[in-house]
Amino acid sequence: MKALLIALALAAPAAELRIEKVFGPETPTGRYKHPASITGLKNGDLMLVYYGGEGEYAVDTGVFGAKWSRATGKWGAPRMIAHDPFRSVGNGVVWQAPDGVVWLFYVVRWGSTWSTSRIQGKVSRDGGETWSDSFVVSDKEGMMVRGQPLALDTGEHLLPVYHETGYDTEMVGPDTTSRFLRYDPRKKEMEWRESGVIRSRKGNLQPAVVQLSPKHLVAYCRRGGGYGPAKDGYIVRAESHDGGWTWSEGADAAFPNPNSAVDLLKLRSGSVLLVYNDSMSERTPLTAALSTDGTKSWPHKRNIAEGKNSFAYPFVIQTADGKIHLVFTSDSRTAVNHAVFDEEWVRGAPSGASPPAR
């Protein structure tokens, strides 16, 4: 797979952006490939998952996982790790917890629309090689998952989820809310408890959350409403000051949002990285913004990918070497892309960015 060198900061050779198309329509997991997620494993490898099949609402969908080997520098072939013989599956989130357990959270749709979904899970104790049977994370109708969990200072795990209502596939209603589930791995029982709701004027979903201090959390969420051209579409921002138990009313942030997923990550330096579509109507460009003051201001911004395409569902992590790894989908939801850059690249002077190599 050919990596495309997109930009090079003149000041430092390390400050570059590389994007490769990991899987395309030719990959035999079905033409459709959407919301990808990624995690760093204890041995230095990476693992990504996505759900694929013949279409978003097809009954043949499954969650597929693939690994990047640090030893070879290559991605292995994807294999199915979650499937339901009677129902469609959706968004998958993979995450290695601090104790080494790899979690897979994914959506199972019980009816014809996503508002009939529940959340199921699996765990792996050998780095994603083998997986447990599936179990219920939330059996509440309309609950879905998209964002990566957060390991809190308390030792608990906080899982961002959302509750979608209604049966209109072209509209996200105002009663759709971002929510959180909380789990304490020190307890014997495996129970994810509800922990806070974010409400907003247009509705919101797919929260991405960071912990700025032991009690202070900030979430950026995809807006509700329609998918057509908009003049009033912004990322929804909310805060918690009690460790994620309660949340402020969601308010419009300074960033546009075309009813598309965003991701938020606190870097090792303490800076906060936001990846989003810098448009109210289109899922292009895909942009990175950097805050050095706890999301109060965002002085640095660079496009990761731009052009006539749809660059959607960013999911971003930082590995122990400081590198930032981003996965996103493109090409009418038929391609999964992997971008690698660092904080210095985001701080660099803006320059034109190009779509992934085809």
Where are the model-predicted features located?
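Asp-box/BNR beta-propeller blade signature and adjacent active/binding-site loops
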Residues: 14-358
